[in-house]
Amino acid sequence: TVERGPGAAAGITYLTRSDFEGTFPRVADADRVMDDAVAALNLYDDEQVAADAALYEDSLATSFVQPLVTSAGSYWQLGEDGELTDLGYELGSDYDDARWEIVLDFVSLSDMQHLVLHGYLATGQISGIGKPLTKEVDGPAQVGSFNQLSYGVGYPAPTVLAQTWNPALAREVGRQLGLEAATLGVDGLYAPCANLHRTPLGGRNYEYFSEDPLVCGTMAAQVVGGARDAGTYCFLKHFAVNNQDSYRDSLYTWLTEQSLRELYLRPFQIAVEGGTTGLMSSYNRVGAVWAGGSRALLTSVLREEWGFEGAVITDYADHQDYMSADQALRAGGDLYMDGVFRNGSFSYGFTQEELSSARGTDRAAAATSYLTNLRRATKNVLYVWLEARAANLDYNTAAAEAGTAPIERPIKTAGPNYVGTALALADAVAATSVVAWAHRALRRRRESR
C-alpha cells in the first residue's frame, strides 16, 4: 500500500483470494464526507517542501546561480530551420551525454520556469539554444483537439485495434498518426492510453485498448514506436490507475501493491521498456497522494526501477488546487499543463536573487532541490523532442539501406498558417450560411401554416 509504518492500514479490509468469505463485502458502506481539515493534510505544504528538501541536504547543486546567457554559440544550437543540428541529434540519441549540463547552462532560470510551467498544448521556444515552439494535441484515435482548426483521420477506437492482436498493425497506425501530426504542424500527441477496462462503465473505455495488461502494454508500445518512427513523440496516459472518468478529480484510489504492479502499472512498464519517452500523470490519487505528485510513482518506480528516460506531464490542471506544480516538480514531474484559466506558477520556487543568497543558510537544501529538479525537468522536455526527431532520422537511414520508403516530415516553419486559417474561415462562413438557410426555411414553413 502507499502508506507505511505502524497502523497505516488500520481498519482497512482488503479483498484477498485466500479469504473471499471474510473479505468480500456483503453490504455497501454508507458514503462519508471527508472533513476539510483532513483533506488539507493531503495538500502540498511547507512541511512536505521541507521533507523533499531534506533529500538534498548532503548534496550540492551544480551551481546556485543559473547562468544568465541569452544565446549559445552555433555549436550549442539544438535545432536550426526546422531540423536538428548534429548536436541535437547526438543529444537525442544519448540521454546521458555529458554535454547536456553545458546546454542547460545556456538556459536562463526564467526560460526554464516558463518551459516547465506552461505545458498546455505546447512547449515554449528557447531561442538561445535553437529550441522551437512545439505543439501537442490529443488523441488516441485521431490527431486533433477540441480547440484545433485541423484534424487528422478518425480511426477506429483503440479497442478495435487491440482486438486484432496485431502489433505490426499497431506500429503502422502509430506511423500514420505521427505523419499526420507532422503534416498538421503538430510535434507531439497526448496519446495513446494504457489504462485498463476495469469496468464496462468506464467513461474513457473507448480510448483504452483492453482489460488485459499484456495486450494493452504491447499495443501501446507499438503505437508509440510507430509515431517515433515518424518523428512525433507521445505522452502515454494516464499514469496511473485512471479507470473511471466521472469523479476522477482527486479521487482516492485504494489498492494493494500486488494489484497495482501486476495490473495497472504493467502496461506502462511494457511501454517504457519499449522506448516510450513521454507519460501523462492522472487526476486521481494513489492512496492519499496525487499521482502527478507521487515521488514513489514518478521517481522510485518509473525512473529508478524501470529506467525511464523522458518527461512526465500533468493532466489538465487549471481547475484543481491539489494539482501542485511544486509537488509535481519535486516528485519527478517535468511539465505542468496549466490550461486556459490558470497561469502556472510555483508557490515554493526561487528567484535568481534568492538562489544566490541561499548558500550557507537554512534554505540551501530547498534551493538545491528546486534548481536541481528544474534543470532535470528542462532536460527531459528537451530530450523528448530531440529523441523523436533523432528516431525519425534513424528510421529513414535504415529505410534507405533496406530500399524501403522513408517517413519524411514536412519542415515546420514559423509564422501564421494562412492556408489553414483561410480554410477554417471558409468553413465557418459555410456553416453560418447553412444555419441561416435552415432558420429561414423553418420560419417560412411556420408562416405558411
Language model features: what each stretch is:
Residues 1-449:
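Glycoside hydrolase catalytic-domain context in secreted enzymes
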